[in-house]
């Protein structure tokens, strides 16, 4: 079984990036869904994408990776707009031939399965919105 630790929208609170790793030291993958506002060297152990507040970062806009039989796509949520966001997310995921989309931006945790697609937003570790608490998520993937 593989363990994926996912966070997003830490917005310069670099100690939270370290804290999540301390809380989840046995992760096989560490993923940051953007708006880390961190220098590249701080994210060496992370799969990290560029968010709308990562102005000077050289992180990619999206990352694809595979764990067991699942294909993951990581992209910050600002790419999906606000009108009909879910449709845009599903379309992007299907175009990338992936099963799971990990995204941030809204600072609100979300887990949703739609049309064979899984959409996950871990929320924010520092600036939660919509009545949510500070959060990150852990995903366990079992092999066949």
At which residue positions do the language-model features occur?
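Active-site-proximal beta-strand elements of phosphoester/diester hydrolases
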Residues: 3-11, 71-78, 118-123
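Active-site environment of divalent metal-dependent phosphoester hydrolases
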Residues: 11-16, 37-41, 53-58, 80-84, ...
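Binuclear metal-dependent phosphoesterase catalytic core
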Residues: 16-18, 67-68, 95-97, 120-144
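Conserved beta-strand scaffold positions in the cores of enzyme catalytic domains, especially
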Residues: 46-48, 101, 119-121
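Helix-adjacent hinge/juxtasegments
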Residues: 49-52, 56-97
